[in-house]
A protein has these predicted regions:
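Regulatory inter-domain linker segments that are low-complexity and enriched
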Residues: 1-45, 149-217, 224-229, 265-278
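Forkhead-associated
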Residues: 55-140, 193-265
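Internal, hydrophobic cores of structured domains that mediate oligomerization or house catalytic pockets
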Residues: 144-146
Length: 278
């Protein structure tokens, strides 16, 4: 599927749904994205979104979806899709168009009465991530960013175990970590919860996964296996959060909560939900 095809599918919404969105503007919660760190945007700038989309949008018709991204120097079709420009592509890389286009999308779900966010970069640029606050359950094919490193987490079969022992539950106990970026490229670690149920990741030699990166804490994050819960990702170690955070890709639609931190294209946004008083 091409990027254009996927984006057109994401745009499909019925007239009935748009009518419901319009009716919900005065009662639905509003969302503010507050710029906390940026190379391009004013600090503490508030980007206001309601059930229909970006407030003060230049679009004539809103459909409950707001697209953030970098305008293209050559592709007006992409530019028309972007509701909020997140910077100047010339500043990022004057010799490449890899960063331009839609970076992420926020939509209001009329049935659940809440906002969802999804990365729409499709491998272009830096991607869109949310900061782990305390802990998060790991899912298969999860992408994690810590410092200059990207970790792809997958579940799998342990070839050292007899085939009859590789049940669905047992497969969930096998965790593979593939490292990209930094000093390690395409380097993989495999852990079996029956042997190691706590995995320390950081730059200290005591860690199970050692990454040479000055942006990391000695123990930057931890992955722990818990019975009946599976693998859990924790930011920091021993009740102390990491300095630069542990970030998880928003490759799937994820519900936005008050206080959520989002990182995209070297911008960090704080999400603030405002309940409507009407």
């Amino acid at each position: 599927m091409t990027i254009d095809q996927d984006m057109s599918i994401d745009d499909e919404i019925s007239e009935e749904s748009i009518y419901k969105l319009k009716e919900s503007v005065d009662t639905a919660p509003k969302l503010e994205l507050i710029v906390k760190e940026s190379l391009f945007l004013e600090e503490n700038l508030k980007i206001k979104i309601n059930a229909l989309g970006l407030e003060e949008s230049s679009k004539k018709e809103l459909n409950g979806k707001t697209y953030f991204g970098l305008p293209s120097p050559v592709d007006e079709k992409i530019n028309k899709k972007i509701d909020f420009p997140t910077g100047n592509n010339d500043i990022i890389n004057t010799n490449s168009d890899i960063h331009y286009g839609v970076q992420f999308r926020i939509k209001f779900d009329i049935n659940e009465y809440c906002y969802y966010i999804k990365d729409c970069s499709y491998g272009r640029g830096y991607g869109t991530f949310m900061k782990v606050i305390n802990s998060m359950k790991i899912r298969d094919n999860m992408l994690i960013n810590i410092g200059n490193n990207y970790l792809v987490i997958t579940f799998g079969v342990d070839d050292s175990e007899p085939e009859e022992n590789n049940t669905i539950d047992e497969n969930q106990k096998i965790l593979s970590i593939k490292v990209f970026g930094g000093d390690l490229v395409n380097y993989s670690y495999v852990f079996n919860a029956n042997q190691v149920n706590k995995i320390l990741i950081g730059k200290d030699e005591k860690c199970n996964v050692v990454l040479i990166d000055e942006l990391l804490d000695d123990v930057h994050c931890m992955i722990e296996f818990k019975n009946n819960k599976g693998w859990i990702l924790y930011d920091g170690y021993e009740n102390k959060n990491s300095e630069n955070g542990t970030w998880v890709s928003l490759a799937e639609d994820t519900q936005i909560y008050d206080g959520m931190l989002i990182q995209s294209n070297q911008n960090i946004y704080l999400c603030h939900l405002i309940e409507n008083q009407q």
